[in-house]
A protein has these predicted regions:
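N-terminal flexible/basic segments that precede or flank functional cores
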Residues: 1-38, 99, 103
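Residue-level detector of short coil/turn "hinge" positions at structural boundaries
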Residues: 15-16, 54, 94
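Alpha-helix N-cap/N′ positions at the starts of helices
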Residues: 38-39, 63
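Short, conserved catalytic or interaction motifs in soluble domains
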Residues: 73
Length: 103
């Protein structure tokens, strides 16, 4: 958000901040959230690059479509470990994982 817009909102009584402030997340927790979001985006991109649907990607990853959808949306019930396993199941390698998480 640009400075002018932020100032206008604050003058109208709105409180402006970051998501970590709003949710009360520690720096470590915010890093985990950012990693999950980056990995979810990479999973969608990988699946689409392979020409797979969520159903076919779920079959490849040996899970259900609904669970796979939760992974692609970085649902809070999904662990980072599960997201990584599914990324590898779609053919990603360590280099792709590290590039995704360091971006």
């Amino acid at each position: 958000m640009d400075k002018v817009k932020k100032e206008k909102l604050e003058k109208k009584g709105w409180k402006v901040g970051d998501i970590d402030e709003y949710l009360g997340l520690s720096p470590a927790e915010m890093t985990i959230v950012e990693m999950k979001v980056a990995l979810a985006k990479a999973l969608v991109a990988k699946r689409k690059a392979l020409g797979e649907t969520q159903v076919s990607a779920a079959i490849i990853a040996k899970t259900s479509q609904s669970r796979y959808a939760k992974v692609e949306h970085a649902d809070s019930s999904v662990s980072l470990e599960l997201m990584i396993k599914m990324f590898f199941a779609l053919g990603a390698n360590k280099k792709e994982l590290l590039e995704t998480l360091s971006a």
